[in-house]
């Protein structure tokens, strides 16, 4: 039995669409087999297989019904005798040869231009500038904090997307919603964290920071300033027990013991920010030893506890603000005093700065005006001689406070230090004491 196609399918538009769809589908199958056999995780190849070619395939398939519809519509206006069969191409006719040549050259140029354009568009969408500046109003806090972070030389996509096509496609689908939210102004302020669909840290962080690496103890010096009249310095020097004292011991001791490959630490949190942890399980993968720890001060039934998500500790459970950290005022004022952008010769400048920075503002402009007004007023009321004779020093202090504020607080997006808990340490937030209570 021969396959008989409807008369409406016998038209140039449907024929071109079917040809495009067939060739594209063959390319997808071929490239998919190549990546499966070679186990290649190249993002560019994944883009072609999962994004670019399916788009071309869709267009080709779409042309088939469009051509059939147009031919059916055209045929209704003709008599049965006027209807024609399949188009005939005869290369003995010079017009046909010229038309075929033009079509071949034009198609080749179009496909090459499309390929180059798609590649460049992809390359731009993967750039730091695209991530940080395209949606400037929304992403300004993240982009600003990122530029001053230890990962400032690492591309956004290296952490947020990583290698491979699967997470690339997920990120673009997520990006479509973000474009929609920005367009309609429905982006939450501030952006909620932790991000539930963030790629696991073991697939991104550990590309550079692998657990098997030995991390020795680290000598750390911090400079603090008191809020007294002299802005007295208070220096702290301590040894951070990051790893074992001896490299031969590896990850048997220290803070990084939590990511020891021979140990699995799991926990359950009762809040979205993962700050309240009533249950922890320790498993020694070598010996099989298992210990469970329950916080009996948290009133929660066994049934409710069993329904909570069980997470395995990874980098992000402690280093939860590795690139987008918004420092508290006491911290960034200490840094500014150390650098000299805020003169420590001004009496009680830290106290005055913390007083004004404790307030909440609607806009950055409003904050800058309030800083200038209240610092001037503070010295006029409490230190009239300083206010009269050291106006330039006060102006420098005001500028330093404003600059530090703008790097860490973004009123338009309701972003400030106390919105995003930082689990490193236990100064402003409970951090380590979420589990070690």
Q: Model-found features: residue ranges?
A:
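Alpha-helical transmembrane segments and their helix-start/interface "positive-inside/aromatic belt" motifs
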Residues: 4-21, 51, 100-104
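A conserved active-site cap/scaffold subdomain adjacent to cofactor or substrate pockets
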Residues: 308, 312, 316, 321-325
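Sequence context of c-type cytochrome heme-c attachment sites
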Residues: 36-58, 64-200, 218-307, 332-341, ...
């Amino acid at each position: 039995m021969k396959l008989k196609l409807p008369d409406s399918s016998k038209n140039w538009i449907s024929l071109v669409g079917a040809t495009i769809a067939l060739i594209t589908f063959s390319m997808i199958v071929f490239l998919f087999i190549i990546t499966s056999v070679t186990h290649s995780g190249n993002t560019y190849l994944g883009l072609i297989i999962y994004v670019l070619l399916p788009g071309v395939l869709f267009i080709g398939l779409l042309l088939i019904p469009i051509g059939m519809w147009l031919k059916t519509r055209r045929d209704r206006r003709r008599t049965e005798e006027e209807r024609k069969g399949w188009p005939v191409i005869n290369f003995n006719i010079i017009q046909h040869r010229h038309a075929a040549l033009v079509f071949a050259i034009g198609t080749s140029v179009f496909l090459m231009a499309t390929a180059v354009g798609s590649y460049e568009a992809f390359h731009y969408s993967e750039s730091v500038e695209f991530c940080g500046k395209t949606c400037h109003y929304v992403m300004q806090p993240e982009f600003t904090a990122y530029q001053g972070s230890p990962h400032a030389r690492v591309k956004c996509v290296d952490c947020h997307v990583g290698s491979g096509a699967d997470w690339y496609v997920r990120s673009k689908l997520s990006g479509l919603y973000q474009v929609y939210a920005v367009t309609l102004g429905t982006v939450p302020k501030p952006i909620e964290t932790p991000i539930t669909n963030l790629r696991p840290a073991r697939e991104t962080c550990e590309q550079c920071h692998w657990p098997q690496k030995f991390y020795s103890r680290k000598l750390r010096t911090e400079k603090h300033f008191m809020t007294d009249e002299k802005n007295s310095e208070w220096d702290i020097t301590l040894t951070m027990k990051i790893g074992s004292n001896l490299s031969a011991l590896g990850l048997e001791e220290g803070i990084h013991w939590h990511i020891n490959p021979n140990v699995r630490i799991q926990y359950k949190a009762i809040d979205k920010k993962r700050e309240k942890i009533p249950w922890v399980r320790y498993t020694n993968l070598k010996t099989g030893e298992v210990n469970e720890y329950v916080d009996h001060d948290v009133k929660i039934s066994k049934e409710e506890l069993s329904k909570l998500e069980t997470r395995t500790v990874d980098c992000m459970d402690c280093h939860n603000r590795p690139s987008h950290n918004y420092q508290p005022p006491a911290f960034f004022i200490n840094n500014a005093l150390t650098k000299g952008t805020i003169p420590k010769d001004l009496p009680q400048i830290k106290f005055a700065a913390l007083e004004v920075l404790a307030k909440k503002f609607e806009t950055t402009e409003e904050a800058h005006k309030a800083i200038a007004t209240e610092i001037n007023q503070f010295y006029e009321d409490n230190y009239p001689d300083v206010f009269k004779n050291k106006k330039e020093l006060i102006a420098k202090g005001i500028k330093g406070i404003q600059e530090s504020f703008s790097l860490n607080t973004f009123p338009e997006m309701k972003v400030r230090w106390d919105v995003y808990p930082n689990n490193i340490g236990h100064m402003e937030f409970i951090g380590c004491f979420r589990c070690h209570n």
